[in-house]
Amino acid sequence: MKIEKPPYFEELEIENYLESILDKNVKLFFQEVDKRYFYWTEIKHRPNQPYASPQQTWKMLKAHRLVQAKQLFLGNHPFHFCVTSFIQQDLHNFDLKLIGGLYKDSISTQEQQEYLKSSLLEEAIASSQIEGAATTTDVAKEMIKSGRKPRNESEQMIINNFRAIQEIENRLDEDMSVNLILDIHEIMTVKTGAAKYAGEFRNHPIYVKDHIDGEIAFTAPDSSEINPLIEDLLNFINREDEFYHPIIKASILHFMIGYIHPFGDGNGRTARALFYWYLIKKGYSLLKHISISRAILDSRTSYDKAFLKTENDNNDLTYFIMYSMKSLRVALQSLVTYRDKKREEKQKAAEISYELTLKGFNKRQADLLGYLSVKPEATVTVPIYSERNGIVRQTATRDLAELVKKGMLRKQKVGKTVVYELVDNT
């Protein structure tokens, strides 16, 4: 994949920009462009430009961005990024949802745990699929839930990702370090072809190929630069004397692992795991309930373009920061959808339970039938029913037997266990 490089200017006309920005139409144009942080190819064909040519518009836009940009140096590699008012607004919204408690008073602890397990699986599977794991999502979930051993390298990659995500929970009190990077990478690559690269940074050149056409998309820094680049990255991530929003820092961390490419293989998986680690460490615990890699997998071309735009446009990290925030937004929406679904299910179950109590069922029986009506695939046993309702097993057995007699439940044996399931009366 190749994208057109923008025009390069030796000098930017800052004074001309500062004069022109006083014009209302120019100011409105830049505000509109800031919303989506347009790249050169989007500016090039944009109608109603306030300058004489697309090239002049781009030159003034570069001046506009330079004036508000924050600078970052890793070794001899200069980077910069802009925190526009629109990015600030998005960050505020993320804070309200990711720290403010999207789950609060909405779904039960058990449902949260169910979704957490599902999200961990999704993240492990999707992160591996981005790197080429061929195993389907359903097969991968079956493997992890059943505990069976992986049958091929694709399945091993998924197991490794799952274990790495779990390991992150144990490392939240640590600062970012070389050991943390090496440990996460080693877990990610065990028993795969990339295992030979574990435990140390590469000592050979790396040419990153495009996942679609196989062409060289990027040449990573020379191996002699890796240690100083990583050291500067660690300093940036760990320092607290200058505040950068955690989502911005995590996005830059994600990008830089991909840019430095410190390992012979497994860089992308490691970068995404460290993105998670940093944000959870900084208090965004709800992030454990969403899968960023699933959002990335579903927009892989945009993911690659975000890297290329950054590199093509004088290492402007804003493109990748914007992409990270969009992926977070998409992933978060999945959680919102799940929460809303659970609310609807609880409301429906409560309505059914109320109607059944009016028909003579006791509250325990009515609640069970209400629950099973929205979870028809679920089953219940005497011990579980007894424990949930705080009653002795004799009473639990009588309740369930009455429901069987009334044709509401079906009793059957699964192995040595007696289970009760809802009778489909549709």
Spell out what each predicted region is.
Residues 1-265, 269-426:
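FIC/Doc superfamily catalytic core
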